[in-house]
């Protein structure tokens, strides 16, 4: 009898996500924070009929049916013992309703987690970027880089800007619980606990007061403002306009919202500072003059008439002066 009990029990490793590092401006003002949320998670190996279970939960909790094919697709590309998220940002009513019916859904649990939030919304979008749900492409890249296990309990990953560039520093180290469970999946005892290690906090060169002022100056315009400290090259403000609220990508952008951004003639998704290609215009003249003086090709008293057009020898393209008669 004891041998049978022992065989029916098994060891299970439950990963836990690390808190993502926070992002501050140069004066310690919080720019990217973590807020508590509740999600509904499913462990495929503990579910007899995954599709049926997902459909029943969607009906019971009045969830978005578009989540069904997405979760089934994720299940085909990840390990069966890793939890998959069916729904996030559950409200109190949904949490209570699931708790009453949880006995019907083995392998399904409500989990508390921290969700990224950007309190300054579209003021910092193109500088900070954003995090969003880990997709199949992300999973493949993580596996290729040997980082997949560290993301076993993580929902989001940096997609743009600072959030993407400093992903390794911000993410942290996953923790885990090693538990003994019975043949029904019930946890009998915890054998080992390794707490997660929070990601590193980042302090940017940006001054949020200057950032907000630059943002205000760009209202109703298209373009960008980049302010630098000439003493050390640090970025004080980084604004591309128009912008958008990155929080819609964190919670899961709808097809309607994304289509509106794509169709917007002002192209808010474009980072006009780092992605825009613009002719340097007259800003290149001091550079060329200094180069000429340095090489002895001209003197401080040299005068040059630019004319209405300029053509690089051996090329067909003509660059036109904004003034018809030239300078």
Predicted features and spans:
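Active-site-adjacent helix/loop patches that line small-molecule binding or acyl-intermediate pockets
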Residues: 223-239, 282-287, 291, 303-310, ...
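Active-site SXXK
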Residues: 28, 56, 98, 127, ...
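Conserved catalytic neighborhood of penicillin-recognizing serine enzymes
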Residues: 267-273, 298-327
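Short, solvent-exposed beta-strand-terminating loops
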Residues: 236-251
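Membrane-proximal periplasmic segments of bacterial cell-envelope enzymes
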Residues: 1-187, 194-195, 220-224, 230, ...
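A conserved hydrophobic secondary-structure block that centers on an alpha-helix together
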Residues: 188-234
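Hydrophobic (often cysteine-bearing) scaffold residues that line and stabilize catalytic clefts
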Residues: 20, 50, 158, 206, ...
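Surface-exposed acidic, glycine/proline-enriched linker/cap segments
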Residues: 251-275
